[in-house]
């Protein structure tokens, strides 16, 4: 029997410009990010970062760290939103690069964007 619960608990992106990316994920994608500094000597995730943790239901932590080398590129992450039309307008106003606007999916509506480092961010509104 494994000690691993096989459940995602953290997503971390290393970004080229932490201030710019923090503003995009906060203002454009609606995440309540908090800036802090881990000075624990960890070469992978030490240093300045902006993060949010969801604690209702299953715990999940999302963080942006200033890249110490090449930033994370080509990853994809998705967030649930209450109103996709409003979220879409907010994402574009904050500088997200549009991949596709809101489209109907079997589970609701979704739209996709690229962040400043080329990662894909999907915003999804559940079907009523």
Map each language-model feature to its residues.
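Eukaryotic phosphotyrosine signaling hubs
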Residues: 8-10, 73-77
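Short amphipathic alpha-helices within nucleic acid-binding modules
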Residues: 24, 85-90
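Vicinal oxygen chelate
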Residues: 1-4, 10, 88-128
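Short hydrophobic/aromatic beta-strand micro-patches
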Residues: 12-14, 78-82
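Short hydrophobic/aromatic beta-strand element in the GNAT-like acyltransferase core
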Residues: 44, 61, 78, 99, ...
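Short acidic/glycine-enriched loop/turn segments that link adjacent beta-strands
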Residues: 39-43, 72-73, 105-109
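Core segments of cupin and vicinal oxygen chelate
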Residues: 5-6, 12-59
């Amino acid at each position: 029997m494994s000690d691993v619960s096989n459940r995602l608990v953290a997503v971390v992106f290393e970004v080229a410009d932490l201030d710019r990316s923090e503003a995009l994920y906060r203002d454009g994608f609606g995440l309540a990010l908090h800036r802090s500094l881990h000075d624990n000597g960890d070469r992978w995730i030490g240093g300045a970062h902006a993060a949010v943790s969801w604690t209702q239901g299953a715990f999940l932590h999302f963080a942006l760290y200033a890249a110490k080398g090449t930033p994370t590129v080509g990853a994809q992450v998705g967030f649930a939103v209450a109103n996709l039309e409003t979220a879409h307008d907010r994402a574009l106003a904050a500088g997200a690069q549009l991949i596709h606007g809101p489209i109907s999916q079997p589970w609701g509506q979704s739209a996709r964007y690229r962040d400043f480092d080329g990662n894909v961010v999907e915003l999804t509104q559940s079907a009523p």
